[in-house]
Amino acid sequence: MRKSNYLWLLLVAVLLLPAQEMAAKKKKEKEVTDRELWAGVLYQMAAPVLSNMSEGKLQENMQVELSPTWDGRDKRVTYMECFGRLMAGLAPWLSLPDDDTAEGKQRRQLREWALKSYAQAVDPESQDYLLWRKEGQPLVDAAYVAESFLRGYDALWVPLDSLTKRRYIEEFTQLRRVDPPYTNWLLFSSTVECFLRKAGSKSDAYRIVSALRKVEEWYVGDGFYSDGPGFAFDYYNSFVLHPMYVECLEVFTNSGKNKIWNAPDCNFQRAQKRMQRFGMILERFISPEGAFPVFGRSITYRTGTLQPLALLAWRGWLPKELSNGQVRAAMTAVFNEKGFLTLGFNGSQPHISDWYTNNGSLYMASLAFLPLGLPADHPFWTDAPQAWTSKKAWGGEEFPKDHAYYE
């Protein structure tokens, strides 16, 4: 080979090497599965909270951010919001059995931290004893703690020692001091009482049934409830109304096997169908690029808007119109690993936060990760990704027509 040709080939090889390395890197990055992405994001969200709280250091180390329009309530509500909302989204994942995969090791670590954190939360001697006995706000986030126990009963409630369990029963019971307004707050009382019922403790049936009856009255049609007597176009059907209504009905009626004699219109199976319809609407909200509409209050809760879709997937309740691969692909397109825990919708945007919002509130975002409670070999994770409705529509593909849901 002539020297000039050799030098030319050497130059080409040197120039191509970075490109080849980049291509190999991209290929390696592409090999990250959707489940690995989801698990990584949720671990990143949960680890700083639980690692600190397990040692009683959350309140010492968490930097609190309050809305510029904060209403002056005790800022310590932040820690209860952070912990309760996080655990409501994390509970299904932590309920999976242990294994020696990288994910399994992270999950086991989070569960160990979580169980210690639960104990810290109700120990009056702990620096991380939460604000159970002041303000009305603790009712809200106690409901998310209770919801975490409902969603992960065997993994998160059963292993707690008897003293910690007794303390939770006492804290949940004393929250009857809070008279909830006639809004989604009624479901917070109901969720706490439903957990007490499941745990074999004395529950207040009136607080459960009156809430269920009121929410049933607030159904306005086509998968939507009003949040109180007047309808508001926001995401509270996602954050509270659909999930807690269905889960309370599930507990109180034994999955629809029993009827509520003084509230016969409160029907578990029908509430499921409404949530399925709402899930179909949420799926259509997701744009081809993975964005969703920004409207209504509490938009800083980000992916918490997807909770009904996540709950339907985790519980195996997806309607026939939505496939596993379609829902997983749509939800994965929405997730963003950055900027979860600061006031804002996408990064730091404090002025869009509401008067009741702090950075603990934002852990509502964890509620989109419920499908991690499905094992890795479940069709939700193994089915090939499919284009979701908006992606098909804007891509010029055939897509299903949408029709209103009537009862």
Set out the residue ranges of the language-model regions:
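Short coil/linker segments at helix-helix boundaries
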Residues: D99-R108
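Non-catalytic carbohydrate-binding regions of carbohydrate-active enzymes
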Residues: C266, R270-D354, D383-E398
